[in-house]
Amino acid sequence: MHDSAQALRGKKLLLVGFTLFSMFFGAGNLIFPPFLGAQAGTALWSAFVGFAVSAIGLPIAGVAAVARAGGLPALAGRVHPRFAQVFAVLVYLSIGPCLAIPRTASTSFEMLTPLVGRSTLGQFLYSLVFFTAAYFVALRPEKLTQRLGRILCPALLVLIVVLFAGCLLRPAASGYGVPTAAYAALPAAQGILDGYQTMDALAALNFGAVIALNIQAVGITEEAAVRRGTIRAGLIAGGMLLVVYAMLTHIGGISGAAFPGCDTGAAVLTALADGLFGRVGQVLLAAIFVIACFNTCVGLIASVGEYFHELLPRLSYPAIAAFFALMSMLLANIGLADILSLSVPVLNAIYPIAIILIAVEFLPERFQRPLVWRLGVLFTALQSIPSALPFGPLSGFMNALPLSGLGFGWLLPALIGIGIGLVL
């Protein structure tokens, strides 16, 4: 039977789902949907369907794939053990301390500058408090359901609902604006492209181990029950993302019509919050960004710390978490631009590989032959790595492949590799 006595249900399931949602929902997740709404205008809901497929469907599939495989190293290990170690290290570093963790502090501080002003000292003090608090919350990764799921996630949802309610009760415009050319032509396709840019499927690969720890902490210890609980929590988080993204997309559609010319999602939200509530709106929006960024920061520190503690068991988890929190604080203040110039191309190179790992995991077992895994990943990497990193003439050739202009040049090689693996 699938439902054992240890099945994760009821309030415990909701808490774990809330925790996973709060780990996913960072600054980028706040910014992308409103900007889509502002740009898509009257084509907003068609674009939103496409956005949901790639911005929600892919990450939740990633959570399920990692749960089914028993962790990211096990999933990537279906290709080769050495590949698994290299790939996992790249994923954890590039989306953790080399990109997303330092950006949680710098982005949330940006939203505070209209209220507190901009200064180097102010940013340093903010990041010091931010990362110190995040470190202490992440110090007990198995307790995140109590800290994120029970407290911070509900607080974040309440603030977003207040902003949405203000938009409904005092709409700044009577309807949505005129869609830009890309959304007018193929709104759903453009929405898929926008959702792909969130790269949340990589975050999904990161979070599996910490979610499993939190499920075990509520008394679920059977391996199969933990896997099923992780997948169910992923579905809860996906449903929450769908509802919150829909609210933010509507907010963006109204804001785009009332305040045209905003060139970022943050500007779209700022214009509407200020128009609805004045200075109180600025405080509301800053609080939303700070809580969302803090939740993601905690989740990433815990995930990266757990992975490297397993990889290097001689180093304690608290020491590893402290190291990455300190490293992220320094990067947020002195070296973020330089590290982004390296980590973003690496992310672009490995993201298609992550998607192929997720996709092959869901193939029927009789098709999951070693060659399918290896050739699928190899052919994907042969396109994605030269396209993302400077490889001279080879990069030019790879960027000439079908769908390269849309960021999907890896898709045809991946399908060819999987096809060859199935035939041989």
Pin down the residues of each PLM region.
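Hydrophobic transmembrane alpha-helices that form the core helical bundles
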Residues: F35, A69, R82-G117, C293-E310, ...
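TM-loop-TM module centered on a large, flexible mid-protein loop between adjacent transmembrane helices
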Residues: P73-H80, V244-F294, I301, E310, ...
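Select transmembrane alpha-helical segments in multipass membrane proteins
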Residues: R9-L20, W45, P81-I95, F124-V129, ...
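Membrane-interface loop-to-helix entry segments
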Residues: A138-C167, S343-I355, R374-L382
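Membrane-water interface regions at transmembrane-helix termini and the short interhelical loops
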Residues: A67-A74, F131-L152, A217-I220, M329-L342, ...
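Selective recognition of specific alpha-helical transmembrane segments in multi-pass small-molecule
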Residues: G57, A61, A155-C167, I231-G256, ...
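Hydrophobic alpha-helical segments and their helix-loop junctions in multi-pass secondary transporters
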Residues: P97, I101, L157-A184, A201-L202, ...
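Hydrophobic, membrane-embedded alpha-helices of multi-pass small-molecule transporters
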Residues: L15-F25, G166-A173, A182-L248, L284-C293, ...
